UniProtKB/Swiss-Prot annotation:
It comes from the Bacteria. Its EC number is 3.6.5.3. Gene3D superfamilies: P-loop containing nucleotide triphosphate hydrolases, Translation factors. Residues 136-139 are annotated as: G4. Keywords: Cytoplasm, Elongation factor, GTP-binding, Hydrolase, Magnesium, Metal-binding, Nucleotide-binding, Protein biosynthesis. NCBIfam families: EF-Tu, PRK00049.1, PRK12735.1, PRK12736.1, small_GTP. It comes from Roseiflexus castenholzii (strain DSM 13941 / HLO8). This is Elongation factor Tu 1. Monomer. HAMAP family: EF_Tu_B (MF_00118_B). Disulfide bonds: none annotated. Pfam families: GTP_EFTU, GTP_EFTU_D2, GTP_EFTU_D3. Belongs to the TRAFAC class translation factor GTPase superfamily. Classic translation factor GTPase family. EF-Tu/EF-1A subfamily.
Length: 401
């Protein structure tokens, strides 16, 4: 059966839910699809379908990242539901990297919690441009003053992390009430908070300026072998565009020269696409490439547009203990993981002359040597991780090869 064609009629925006475990991110995601489905602007996706990470289903903790799609009158949205559990912050980094804007979900009775702070910090690090807040479970609070205090605390938290806390919209509501309602009337009072939220997302999160005219680049997130058709790589196009017949290179994660291949198809949401452009989440079918010849962490790029490098200088901020960072300094030769685009790569650190150690809270320029070359360029941002947590955030200042 021929696949449906994806029609591009509205601006496309990537959003996602972030926040502390059990504050209602997945319930809200399901509720959005339910309410918009009443307008014919989405397909309802249930809580269980979103929370479909079987090994963790028992504890009700979301681990995998789930993509849903929906529309408003103004835009077409791809929405990722991000894991809230600290162990899966790594997934959070891959998810948040895909956001033009975030919906921060905070349970009103609990207020901001450690993971709320960590997610806001990460959103800042991976440069999520804008955020709206959904203050959930307000039906469990009958004290208006307490609600206002929680809002105040949230605005302060956002401001402290470089977001405009005073102007960010905070929508109050109950995701569960909207999700469990049996009403088919879009004007039912329990649905109003969802409509208000989508309105805030439409109005407050800017339509991103896509880097369509730059050379094509897509970080590879996943690789699939399709019998009889070849190998498909998936990811979000960072810049440029790609269509069937284009020659591309697979760059990085190897000491060998980049491999050239030809694109034999592009798909989005299981529909064929004439051309994938910056900002799209796509699958790209590659000619003559074995499933084993390509891996997560590599990039697909216009030939010659980006090269793999192992050594670079970087400006790095080392998180304080209070921000979830290290409690102790580190020294030259420290070998953490560098989280670059879609993968962790081990690297060794050299410090500038006269610097003997780096304290939590320091800003420092360092020289990094990765164990394997990766597609990098000046201005690229990355996280430094150790033992499953973020200990620093950096930006590449110069390539040294």
């Amino acid at each position: 059966m021929a696949k449906q064609k994806f029609e591009r009629t509205k601006p496309h925006v990537n959003v996602g839910t972030i926040g502390h475990v059990d504050h209602g991110k997945t319930t809200l995601t399901a509720a959005i699809t339910k309410v918009l489905a009443l307008q014919g602007a989405a397909q309802f996706v249930s809580y269980d379908q979103i929370d479909n990470a079987p090994e963790e289903r028992a504890r009700g903790i979301t681990i995998a990242i789930r993509h849903v799609e929906y529309q408003t009158a103004k835009r077409h949205y791809a929405h990722v539901d991000c894991p809230g559990h600290a162990d899966y912050i790594k997934n959070m980094i891959t998810g948040a990297a895909q956001m033009d804007g975030a919906i921060l979900v905070v349970s009103a009775p609990d207020g901001p919690m450690p993971q709320t702070r960590e997610h806001v910090l990460l959103a800042r690090q991976v440069q999520v441009p804008a955020m709206v807040v959904f203050l959930n479970k307000v039906d469990m609070m009958d004290d208006e003053e307490l609600l206002e205090l929680v809002e105040l605390e949230l605005r302060e938290l956002l401001s402290n992390h470089g977001f405009p806390g005073d102007e960010i919209p905070i929508i109050r509501g109950s995701a569960l009430a909207a999700l469990s309602s049996t009403s088919t009337d879009i004007n039912a009072p329990e649905y109003q908070c969802i409509l208000d939220l989508m309105n805030a997302v439409d109005e407050y999160i800017p339509t991103p300026v896509r880097e369509v005219d730059k050379p094509f680049l897509m970080p590879i997130e996943d690789v699939f072998g399709i019998k009889g058709r070849g190998t498909v790589v998936t990811g979000r196009i960072e810049r440029g565009k790609v269509k069937m017949g284009d020659t591309v290179e697979i760059v990085g994660m190897s000491h060998e020269a980049p491999k050239k291949t030809v694109v034999t198809g592009v798909e989005m949401f299981q529909k064929t696409l004439d051309e994938g452009i910056a900002g799209d989440n796509v699958g790209v079918l590659l000619r003559g490439i074995e499933r084993t010849e390509v891996e997560r962490g590599q990039v697909l790029a216009a030939p010659g547009s980006i090269k793999p490098h192992a050594k670079f200088k970087a400006n790095v901020y080392v998180l304080k203990k209070e921000e979830g960072g290290r409690h102790t300094p580190f020294f030259p030769g420290y070998r953490p993981q560098f989280y670059i685009r879609t993968t962790d790569v081990t690297g060794a650190i050299s410090l500038p002359a006269g610097v003997e150690m780096v304290m939590p809270g320091d800003n420092i320029e360092m020289l990094v040597e990765l164990i394997v070359p990766v597609a990098i360029e000046e201005g690229l941002r990355f996280a430094i991780r150790e033992g499953g947590r973020t200990v620093g955030a950096g930006v590449v200042s110069a390539i040294v090869d």
